[in-house]
Amino acid sequence: MADVMDERIRAIQITSGFGFTAGAFLVALSLFLYPSLPAANETNKILEILSKQESGGWMMLHATLVLGFVLVAIGFTGYGFLLHLKGSSGAASIITACAVIGGTLWAAFLSAEFFVHPFIMNLASLEPGLGTMLFTLYWFWKLGAIALAAVLLFTAVAAAGLAGTSRGLQPVWLGWGGAFFAVLGIVVYAIDFLSAGATGAPINPLRTPFVRFAVGLPLQLWLGAVGVMLMMEWANRRPVNASAGGRRDTVQTTGRAPKASLEQTPSMERQRPGAAPAAPSAPEPPPLPPPIP
């Protein structure tokens, strides 16, 4: 069982490490290339900026974002399994649920941009009023969904950082650093949400450089650092079978128990299996007394 558990841990490490590293790179690259947009209620200005974007480039930008968030969700799911094996089942449940739901929201609403952009641009050129109305409805719905998705991923980062530090999976500076920026992101989104509820202004914290670079960039660096660390541990953690020179136990390869050597087998166990032990011979009768003369 020890070698099976070791193989599980190594599989989790390489899967989660690759998901974190590749996902963080794709998300950071996409957000760096993403144009700065005005407030959500300034629909005419948003449409003016989007009209200058090429449909193919806009679709590829969002496809890269979708792939990045899917890989990040896979990384968090694997990290949750790793924490579960270490005994932190509560934190693992929080991480897995938040990552799966948050990644699904990001992927679902960003993938709509694959076809919304050319559709809205064509409709706005024919029916400006109808195009603006449909775009406004979609845009507000999208911003609310991805705001919730961002808070869920922030929660996953905070739980992974704190639980990983307590279980020795991360150094203290890395775990607590990720948790700090994740909590900071949650606070910023909460303030923006409360402000939108009080003033009626639209929620869109991603349009500000502070959220995109002061909060988002450190978290993407955290994802990349955790991913690289997991892949390094995977590379340094040799399989049990490889360390044993490639020899595998007979139970694992043939399903039969290994045969003991004659030197390790007692004399009573050297008999053929199924043969009954020989009955002890009867004692010889005592010698007759000498004849009487």
Feature roles, as predicted:
Residues Q271, A275-S281:
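A general signal for intrinsically disordered, low-complexity N-terminal leader regions
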Residues A2-L262, P266, G274, P291:
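Hydrophobic, aromatic-enriched alpha-helical segments typical of multi-pass transmembrane helices
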Residues S281-I292:
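Intrinsically disordered, low-complexity proline-rich regions
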